[in-house]
């Protein structure tokens, strides 16, 4: 199985390529793991890989150009029939059935984010699927990517001595995150939502909360079952659903 990894810290993956079941699979040629560091694609002398988010707020996002160039380089190396995965708390929760689904792929590219995440337009244009390893926060996507590699590799023929072993293997406010955007303002004809450029912090707060509620309702509705929505949250979620229905008509 061919796996490409997009990471600012590729050396972290020695934990799985040098040890254990996955390490043996690499040595035997059953796993071919390759790396692309966005920092190698930065154009300035400081090799900058982060940028400020539109709309303000704490933290930074991964800079669009180095990240996108790294993904494109990995795609070119992979050739046809490669699936690009972004490890993200906003993704589908990784379960064994999901692992089995991904193990059927001959080639995967895993994008390990850092900082507060990546530009939403990169997710829309360059990412095929988002997967999450759980409802908690990590410092980056490297550990989730390693988790996915480890889980998927167990289903690659020959990695385990006995396939029966594999067959027998047994959020801060409770909402998914809202979409994020950084420079450029227009990417492939898709522009940053006007509200994030308005400078009105209250409008931005309400937009982000509404998007967070709506995304949770669409992707992980069971999370809402455990929440007692405030009047504001209930109203914003109703607006999101109404707007979505209007768009689909």
Curated annotation (Swiss-Prot):
Key words of the record? Cytoplasm, Methyltransferase, S-adenosyl-L-methionine, Transferase, tRNA processing
Cellular location of this protein? Cytoplasm
Looking up Pfam families in the UniProt record yields: tRNA_m1G_MT (PF01746)
One molecular function GO term is: tRNA (guanine(37)-N1)-methyltransferase activity
Q: Which residues bind S-adenosyl-L-methionine?
A: 113, 133-138
**InterPro entries attached to this UniProt entry:** Alpha/beta_knot_MTases, tRNA_m1G_MeTrfase_C_sf, tRNA_m1G_MeTrfase_TrmD, tRNA_m1G_MTases_N, tRNA_MeTrfase_TRMD/TRM10
One GO biological process term: tRNA N1-guanine methylation
| Coiled-coil annotated residue ranges, if any | none
Look up keyword Transmembrane and say if it applies. no
Q: What is its EC number?
A: 2.1.1.228
Q: Which reaction does it catalyse?
A: guanosine(37) in tRNA + S-adenosyl-L-methionine = N(1)-methylguanosine(37) in tRNA + S-adenosyl-L-homocysteine + H(+)
Extract one GO cellular component term from the record.
cytosol
Q: Transmembrane residues, as ranges?
A: none
Question: Mainly localized where?
Answer: cytoplasm
Quote the Gene3D superfamilies the UniProt record gives: 3.40.1280.10, tRNA(m1g37)methyltransferase, domain 2
In terms of NCBIfam families, this protein maps to:
PRK00026.1, trmD
**Which HAMAP family would you find in this protein's record?**
TrmD
Q: What does this protein do?
A: Specifically methylates guanosine-37 in various tRNAs.
What quaternary arrangement does the UniProt entry report?
A: Homodimer.
Which family does the entry's similarity section mention? Answer: Belongs to the RNA methyltransferase TrmD family.
Please report the name of this protein according to its UniProt entry: tRNA (guanine-N(1)-)-methyltransferase
- The source organism is Tolumonas auensis (strain DSM 9187 / NBRC 110442 / TA 4)
Print the organism lineage. Bacteria, Pseudomonadati, Pseudomonadota, Gammaproteobacteria, Aeromonadales
The gene behind this protein is: trmD
